[in-house]
Amino acid sequence: MLVLRSGLTKALASRTLAPQVCSSFATGPRQYDGTFYEFRTYYLKPSNMNAFMENLKKNIHLRTSYSELVGFWSVEFGGRTNKVFHIWKYDNFAHRAEVRKALANCKEWQEQSIIPNLARIDKQETEITYLIPWSKLEKPPKEGVYELAVFQMKPGGPALWGDAFERAINAHVNLGYTKVVGVFHTEYGELNRVHVLWWNESADSRAAGRHKSHEDPRVVAAVRESVNYLVSQQNMLLIPASFSPLK
């Protein structure tokens, strides 16, 4: 009897001490790197577009002395016109907070650019994004035009749609007519949204490449798989500003 009790006690003890498996709400590779990218979109009054851009051309150096400007574009096609789109890079949220505080106290920046340009802006939007784990920021080989393609995905994150989406992106890249600058996933803003920033030599070379891709069985197969996770999509053709780091 004592032997039986001893064996039962050991069995219960081992069950009690067994490690517990904890569930996680993570939906993809964890974001250990704090670096993020802020997408800012300004809708301008049509009569003020040129004045706004001229002001920034003269004063953008005041702003870029505080944080890195990735690119600055005007929207040529896709949605509302008289619109500009720009991307800013930050090390982390504390870095952005420091930059915003410093800019608010920069008299030269406030007086020469912010105050005159505020009256020219009709609406502002901002999103905080991270690069998808398998993407990195790439600089195009030469000047060109850019396309921002925005994909609204089904909830689940990169763990759900990441592999299929990557295959669809690479299928286009492998045809050689376009380059990926970066693939971004929204952290603040419209969630489950993916932004793909493409570079093309020209709008015509993009059009020719797209026509070719529609007839390529590898692209067709990859896209068919990826659209299973897609809700909607839209795009814009972007023209880089003269002061944009990405030309």
UniProtKB/Swiss-Prot annotation:
InterPro entries: Dimeric_a/b-barrel, NIPSNAP, NipSnap_domain. It holds the Pfam family NIPSNAP. One of its GO terms (cellular component) is mitochondrion. The modification N6-succinyllysine is found at residues 45, 57. SUPFAM superfamilies: Dimeric alpha+beta barrel (SSF54909). One of its GO terms (biological process) is mitophagy. Belongs to the NipSnap family. This is Protein NipSnap homolog 3B. The lineage of its organism: Eukaryota, Metazoa, Chordata, Craniata, Vertebrata. The gene is NIPSNAP3B.
